Swiss-Prot record:
PANTHER family: SUGAR FERMENTATION STIMULATION PROTEIN A (PTHR30545:SF2). It comes from the Archaea. Gene3D superfamilies: 2.40.50.580, 3.40.1350.60. Pfam families: SfsA, SfsA_N. Coiled coil: none annotated. Transmembrane segments: none annotated. This is Sugar fermentation stimulation protein homolog. One of its GO terms (molecular function) is DNA binding. Belongs to the SfsA family. It comes from Methanobrevibacter smithii (strain ATCC 35061 / DSM 861 / OCM 144 / PS). The gene is sfsA. InterPro entries: SfsA, SfsA_C, SfsA_N.
Length: 239
């Protein structure tokens, strides 16, 4: 389905936006609960996908916004799919070599975004999994002077995910937090100490505990989104 171009006007709450389409104000679902205040500014060009579902409260979903001449993806949940597909395609060198791949692995009372492992057979021919790797994906849209930062608003949930990864690592598993920069202008990554010192400090603690940090970016076009197969640098220090 083709995208519909519009002009962003207002965001009454986290979930909806008022967008002008062909001279008429339409209500669009915003699939990103972050503030995105540096992106969603009055007059910004946006791209929407219409829905054929008559039961939906909103006719459109906001997928992209144009910022600094670049197409930025606002579909935060799409980050998980982009990373998962890139793993299957062998585009992430740090995550190659696994024979078992799973989305949304249940761990205690939480779900980890991606689970990788290797399949082996026991002496009776029964399959079992070894080399477990748990991956939590975070989509990043905030850019400050070419530097991607996460989160753009305080996130208790994000800090909780990091603590879960620390526990998994301490239990002998491989654990990874994967930051996918969804804004093409981002060239490296730093946690947002100014907006969320708790998450930022927990990220430092996670790295010290052995949780791996991977940073990649993606190319956005209206024809599709693809991960750029090259890891980027990060700096966890408080500036």
């Amino acid at each position: 389905m083709d995208y519909v171009k519009g002009i962003f006007k207002n965001r009454p709450n986290r979930f909806i936006a008022e967008v002008e389409v062909d001279g008429k104000i339409e209500i669009a679902h915003v699939p990103n609960t972050g503030r995105c205040k540096e992106l969603l500014v009055d007059g910004a060009a946006v791209y929407l996908k219409p829905s054929d579902n008559p039961k939906r409260k909103t006719r459109f979903t906001l997928h992209f916004v144009v910022n600094k001449g670049e197409l930025v993806s606002l579909y935060s949940q799409e980050a998980n799919s982009i990373v998962y597909d890139a793993i299957l395609d062998g585009k992430i060198k740090e995550l190659q070599g696994y024979s078992y791949h799973q989305r949304e692995k249940q761990v205690d009372d939480s779900r980890i975004d991606i689970y990788l492992a290797n399949q082996e057979d026991d002496c009776c021919g029964m399959e079992f999994l070894v080399d477990s790797c748990y991956i939590e994906v975070k989509g990043v849209t905030l850019i400050v002077d070419g530097e991607a930062r996460f989160p753009d608003a305080p996130t208790e949930r994000g800090a909780k995910h990091l603590k879960e990864l620390i526990k998994l690592k301490n239990d002998g598993n491989r654990a990874v937090v994967f930051f996918l920069i969804q804004h093409p202008a981002g060239n490296d990554f730093r946690p947002n100490w100014e907006n969320d010192p708790k998450f930022s400090q927990t990220l430092v603690e996670a790295e010290n505990a052995g949780v791996e940090i991977l940073v990649y970016k993606c190319n956005n076009t209206l024809e599709g989104i693809e991960l750029v197969p090259k890891s980027l640098d990060y700096d966890l220090s408080r500036k």
